[in-house]
C-alpha cells in the first residue's frame, strides 16, 4: 500500500495556480501533493552572445529551494557562495525540457528565464518545476503575441514530467519523499504532450533493473504525463 493509498499508476493531485505573482510575464504555483514550487517566466529583449545575429531566441532556467522547504533547514546557496552540483543539474534539465516546447526561430531575439523556487519539497521537485514552468512559459508567450511583439506564437505544445520508480519490487508513478528515499530504482521522465521523450534520467539505487522493467516504467510515465498535460491544458483555459 502506498502512503496516500494511491494505485501504482496514479499521480498525486496536481494543481496549477496561474498569475500567482503580479510582476512576471508568467507565474504559476504548481503543487504535486505536498510538493509546491513557484515558477515564473521573465522576458528580456536580446539573446546570449553566442546566439547574436542568428535570429533565434533562448530559454534558460534557474532552480532553488527555500531553506525550510525540507525537513531540516538547508543554508541558502548564496550564503555558501556557490551553487551545488544538484542545483546546476536540475536547472539545466528544466531549460532543456522547455526549449523542446518552443520554436526558437519563431521566438526571435528574446530570452525567457524560468525561475523555479521550491517552497515545500516532498519528492519530485524537478518534475513539478518542469510542469509548472511550462504553463508559466505559455502565459509569457501569449503576452508577447498579445502585445504585438510576436506575430506567431512559438509554442509547439505542452511539456510535462513525472518521476517513476521501483519500490519494494513494484513499479510506481510520481514518488513522494518516503517512496523516493526507499526506491530501488528512481527515474525522471520528460515528454511532449504527444508522448515523445525529451529526457530520461534513471538510476538503479540498489538492484539493477531489467529491460522489461524499464519499459514498464516508461509506460507508467507516459500515462502519468498524459494526466498531467490534461491538467496543464485545463489550467490554461481558465
UniProtKB/Swiss-Prot annotation:
The gene is rph. GO terms for molecular function: 3'-5'-RNA exonuclease activity; tRNA binding; tRNA nucleotidyltransferase activity. Phosphate binds at residues 86, 124-126. PROSITE patterns: RIBONUCLEASE_PH. SUPFAM superfamilies: Ribonuclease PH domain 2-like (SSF55666), Ribosomal protein S5 domain 2-like (SSF54211). HAMAP family: RNase_PH. It holds the Pfam family RNase_PH. One of its GO terms (biological process) is tRNA processing. Gene3D superfamilies: GHMP Kinase, N-terminal domain (3.30.230.70). Homohexameric ring arranged as a trimer of dimers. This is Ribonuclease PH. Its EC number is 2.7.7.56. It catalyses: tRNA(n+1) + phosphate = tRNA(n) + a ribonucleoside 5'-diphosphate. Phosphorolytic 3'-5' exoribonuclease that plays an important role in tRNA 3'-end maturation. Removes nucleotide residues following the 3'-CCA terminus of tRNAs; can also add nucleotides to the ends of RNA molecules by using nucleoside diphosphates as substrates, but this may not be physiologically important. Probably plays a role in initiation of 16S rRNA degradation (leading to ribosome degradation) during starvation.
Amino acid at each position: 500500500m502506498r502512503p496516500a493509498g494511491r494505485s501504482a499508476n496514479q499521480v498525486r493531485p496536481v494543481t496549477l495556480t496561474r498569475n500567482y505573482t503580479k510582476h512576471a510575464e508568467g507565474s504559476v504555483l504548481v503543487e504535486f501533493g505536498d510538493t509546491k514550487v513557484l515558477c515564473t517566466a521573465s522576458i528580456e529583449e536580446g539573446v546570449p552572445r553566442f546566439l547574436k545575429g542568428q535570429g533565434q531566441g533562448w530559454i534558460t532556467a534557474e532552480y532553488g529551494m527555500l531553506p525550510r522547504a525540507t525537513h531540516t533547514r538547508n543554508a541558502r546557496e548564496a550564503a555558501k557562495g556557490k551553487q551545488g552540483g544538484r542545483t546546476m543539474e536540475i536547472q539545466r534539465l528544466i531549460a532543456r525540457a522547455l526549449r523542446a516546447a518552443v520554436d526558437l526561430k519563431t521566438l526571435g531575439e528574446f530570452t525567457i528565464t524560468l525561475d523555479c523556487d521550491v517552497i515545500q519539497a516532498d519528492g519530485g521537485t524537478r518534475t513539478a518545476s518542469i510542469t509548472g514552468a511550462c504553463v508559466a512559459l505559455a502565459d509569457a508567450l501569449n503576452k508577447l503575441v498579445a502585445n504585438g511583439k510576436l506575430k506567431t506564437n512559438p509554442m509547439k505544445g505542452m511539456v510535462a514530467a513525472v518521476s517513476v520508480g521501483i519500490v519494494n519490487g513494484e513499479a510506481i508513478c510520481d514518488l513522494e519523499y518516503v517512496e523516493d528515499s526507499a526506491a530501488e530504482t528512481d527515474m525522471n521522465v520528460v515528454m511532449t504532450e504527444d508522448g515523445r521523450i525529451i529526457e530520461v534520467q534513471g538510476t538503479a539505487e540498489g538492484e539493477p533493473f531489467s529491460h522489461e522493467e524499464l519499459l514498464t516504467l516508461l509506460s507508467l510515465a507516459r500515462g502519468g504525463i498524459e494526466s498531467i498535460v490534461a491538467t496543464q491544458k485545463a489550467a490554461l483555459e481558465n
